[in-house]
């Protein structure tokens, strides 16, 4: 049994064509156990309207985005394995996959890996942080059997 608990919420109008829950679990299992022995993550799949609202409210950006990460910070006296929530916008992920000439599955996997690293405290604001995070993403994606998600940018 996995040491990562997944709470998958499908909050988009059309759910056909989305990755199966087992794939989301596989992606979480590919990234989190190397950092934490136990984790619980909520992944909420949303449409552009909800992504736009959340991105505006929490990041001040007036557009939908691919993935938002909301780390859970419990008070010190509470010991919970809850890592946080990932909000992933279906339409943005599908559009980006096409633009970046990636398979949809590959880009979904990348968004889960990318979001989990944010939940773990990684960031890409500064160049050195971005380099470290992208390197980890590439390593994890390749371990999961996918290509380097930043390959096109490196060519």
Curated annotation (Swiss-Prot):
Record-listed E.C. numbers: 3.1.-.-
Subcellular location: Cytoplasm
A GO CC annotation given for this chain: cytoplasm
Gene Ontology MF terms in the entry: metalloendopeptidase activity; RNA endonuclease activity; zinc ion binding
Note accompanying the cofactor annotation: Binds 1 zinc ion.
Superkingdom classification of source: Bacteria
Primary enzyme class: hydrolase
A Pfam family it matches: YbeY
Keyword entries, A-Z: Cytoplasm, Endonuclease, Hydrolase, Metal-binding, Nuclease, Ribosome biogenesis, rRNA processing, Zinc
Cofactor: Zn(2+)
Main location: cytoplasm
InterPro entries associated with the record: MetalPrtase_cat_dom_sf_prd, YbeY, YbeY_CS
Ligand binding (Zn(2+)): 114, 118, 124
Signal sequence, renumbered to the chain: none
One BP term from GO: rRNA processing
Function description: Single strand-specific metallo-endoribonuclease involved in late-stage 70S ribosome quality control and in maturation of the 3' terminus of the 16S rRNA.
HAMAP family: Endoribonucl_YbeY (MF_00009)
NCBIfam families per the UniProt record, alphabetical: rRNA maturation RNase YbeY
Record family assignment: Belongs to the endoribonuclease YbeY family.
Protein name: Endoribonuclease YbeY
Native source species: Photorhabdus laumondii subsp. laumondii (strain DSM 15139 / CIP 105565 / TT01)
